[in-house]
């Protein structure tokens, strides 16, 4: 028995393991449950009881020797695999990163700015948190006007000495600040975010973007206003766009009008979006009310002017033929990615 152990030890020591295939063959021959080492352990019961402890120690040493040879071979193969791994190929092209896109509302707003600045309008901005004085009083809103009610306006504080503080309901306060700070002639557009306490639906939202325009000079007429709006509409919606002006009322303009374009979905035939009328409103406009000019320190006997205002989000709906304004505020990448340049 001792001689057999010595012979098997010599076989293990002399066994060459150069690859994974030879390693697997070594395991099958020596270390598996039916291998040579296990066979010798099976013969241990035939050994004289006096010699059995010593022979058992020799067998355990033989088993450990075989297991150590397997472990050394596996470690060596693992190291070789790491060193033989292909190096980083710096000539390979980089992975293309995902590029976002400009939001459709911002795209439309950018186009609006370019159109009006090409006409000679400057750009003015102001605070979104406003005083009642600039949002209503100086714009000729009477004290009992519905817009002053909490059902329509987000008030921050009320009854303060400096006046009520609110989230602006339009960008007209920017026009007021411009008229107070600058002398005519004035030609500006006022883009920005506005807030109204409205029910959220496919056509309205509690926060949206607005662009208003103001032009004050000598002998400005309603014909000048119409020419400006026609020029804008053709550049924004195409040369074949049709417009109509409807008489309306706004506290800050007189006379006042609302401007409609043919419905983008039905082409003027009438559908759900245009409420079967064939027209969609895009803006309000009119000649600046004399009271507004007086409130801002401008003499209406010397100067005249026009103003207009439109929803940027609604204009984006028209341009891209989208029927739900809420899509602009959900930040759904599936929708926004359609507007990549």
Curated annotation (Swiss-Prot):
Its EC number is 6.1.1.20. The keyword Aminoacyl-tRNA synthetase applies. Mg(2+) binds at residue 254. Its cofactor is Mg(2+). GO terms for biological process: phenylalanyl-tRNA aminoacylation. It comes from the Bacteria. Keywords: Aminoacyl-tRNA synthetase, ATP-binding, Cytoplasm, Ligase, Magnesium, Metal-binding, Nucleotide-binding, Protein biosynthesis. It catalyses: tRNA(Phe) + L-phenylalanine + ATP = L-phenylalanyl-tRNA(Phe) + AMP + diphosphate + H(+). Tetramer of two alpha and two beta subunits. Binds 2 magnesium ions per tetramer. It is an enzyme of class 6 (ligase). InterPro entries: aa-tRNA-synth_II, aa-tRNA-synth_II/BPL/LPL, Phe-tRNA-synth_IIc_asu, Phe-tRNA_ligase_II_N, Phe_tRNA_ligase_alpha1_bac, Phenylalanyl-tRNA_Synthase, tRNA-bd_arm. The keyword Cytoplasm applies. HAMAP family: Phe_tRNA_synth_alpha1. This is Phenylalanine--tRNA ligase alpha subunit. One of its GO terms (molecular function) is phenylalanine-tRNA ligase activity. GO terms for cellular component: cytoplasm. Pfam families: Phe_tRNA-synt_N (PF02912), tRNA-synt_2d (PF01409). It is found in: Cytoplasm. Signal peptide: none annotated. Belongs to the class-II aminoacyl-tRNA synthetase family. Phe-tRNA synthetase alpha subunit type 1 subfamily. It comes from Chlorobaculum tepidum (strain ATCC 49652 / DSM 12025 / NBRC 103806 / TLS) (Chlorobium tepidum).
């Amino acid at each position: 028995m001792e001689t057999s152990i010595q012979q098997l030890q010599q076989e293990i020591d002399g066994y060459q393991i150069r690859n994974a295939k030879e390693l697997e063959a070594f395991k099958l021959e020596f270390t598996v449950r039916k291998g040579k080492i296990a066979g010798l352990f099976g013969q241990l019961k035939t050994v004289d009881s006096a010699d059995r402890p010593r022979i058992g120690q020799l067998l355990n040493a033989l088993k450990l020797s075989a297991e150590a040879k397997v472990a050394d071979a596996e470690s060596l193969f693992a190291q070789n695999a790491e060193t033989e791994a292909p190096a980083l190929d710096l000539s390979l092209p980089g992975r293309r990163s995902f590029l976002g896109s400009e939001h459709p509302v911002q795209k439309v707003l950018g186009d609006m700015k370019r159109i009006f600045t090409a006409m000679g309008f400057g750009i003015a901005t102001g605070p979104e948190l406003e005083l009642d004085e600039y949002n209503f009083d100086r714009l000729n809103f009477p004290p009992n006007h519905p817009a002053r009610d909490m059902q329509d306006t987000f008030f921050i504080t009320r009854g303060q000495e400096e006046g009520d503080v609110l989230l602006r309901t339009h960008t007209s306060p920017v026009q007021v600040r411009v008229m107070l700070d600058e002398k005519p002639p004035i030609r500006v557009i006022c883009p920005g975010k506005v807030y109204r306490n409205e029910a959220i639906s496919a056509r309205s939202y509690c926060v949206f973007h607005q662009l208003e325009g103001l032009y004050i000079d000598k002998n400005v007429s309603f014909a000048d206003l119409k020419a400006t709006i026609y020029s804008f509409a053709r550049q924004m919606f195409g040369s074949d766009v049709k417009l109509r002006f409807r008489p309306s009322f706004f506290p800050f303009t007189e006379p006042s009008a609302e401007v409609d374009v043919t419905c983008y979905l039905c082409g003027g035939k009438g559908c759900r979006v245009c409420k079967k009328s064939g027209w969609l409103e895009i803006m309000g406009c009119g000649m600046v009310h004399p009271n507004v000019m007086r409130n801002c320190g401008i003499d209406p006997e010397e100067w005249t002017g026009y103003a207009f205002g439109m929803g940027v989000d609604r204009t984006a709906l028209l341009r891209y033929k989208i029927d739900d304004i809420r899509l602009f505020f959900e930040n759904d990448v599936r929708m926004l990615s359609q507007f990549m340049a």
